[in-house]
Amino acid sequence: EWIFTAPPFWVIIIVIAAIAWLAKGWKLAIGSAIGLLLVVSIGQWNNTMQTLALTIVAVIIAILIAVPLGIWAARSQTVSTVVRPILDFLQTMPAFVYLIPAIFLFGVGVVPGMVATVLFAVAPGVRLTELGIRGVDREVVEAGNAFGATPGRILRQIQLPLAMPSIMAGVNQVIMLSLSMSVIASMVGAPGLGKDIIQALSRTAIALGFEAGLAV
């Protein structure tokens, strides 16, 4: 969190704009800079950086769980059979329900919010990774086998590159769900914009709620 909150706001804006420029071009960079300057102007910079930090860490953890598990499920029907009902269960539970076991196990604070966010976001990453690996043309895989490629090499050089669009769609879903859940996680003590949103709801503070919602 201190990585985002300690430096001056203009340093963070420049870094994020540069990353956006390298990733997608100048339009995204300008849009990111304008959006962050708007956050500064409404006085929500620290809360936004806290929410961003929570979201980034949750996304990284969720991806580190989802992608390997999705690959394993794609390569083993037994694992897929075991994992599928668990993912169904995770995706059918309301977002607020994730907070209950997190509070029971970890108390109130950042950790239960992080755990709840990861659990809420991980399922689509697993599903779309498995779908992408299973969707690779079987003939391409058989051609790799015919040339003597090992299973690991087939995975790295054939299946993962061809499945990347589906995997990235899963990563996109993980990011969106993590962002939405990181706001709800403020109900159990996680810092960030969610605290202002909850206060706005409890006090009917329309202006505060609008500012926090705009920052999100």
Please give the residue ranges for each predicted region:
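Short cytoplasmic-facing helical segments at TM-TM junctions of multi-pass membrane proteins
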Residues: 125-173, 193, 197
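Transmembrane-helix boundary motif in ABC transporter permease subunits
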Residues: 18-23, 35-46, 58-87
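Juxtamembrane membrane-interface segments at transmembrane alpha-helix termini
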Residues: 41-52, 61-67, 126-134, 194
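Transmembrane alpha-helices
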Residues: 115-119, 151-185, 213-216
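Interfacial loop/helix-cap signal at membrane boundaries in integral membrane proteins
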Residues: 1-8
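Generic hydrophobic transmembrane alpha-helix motif, especially the helices
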Residues: 54-57, 61-67, 71-74, 87-121
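Hydrophobic, membrane-inserted alpha-helices
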Residues: 10-18, 32-37, 97-101, 161
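Hydrophobic alpha-helical transmembrane segments of polytopic membrane proteins
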Residues: 193-216
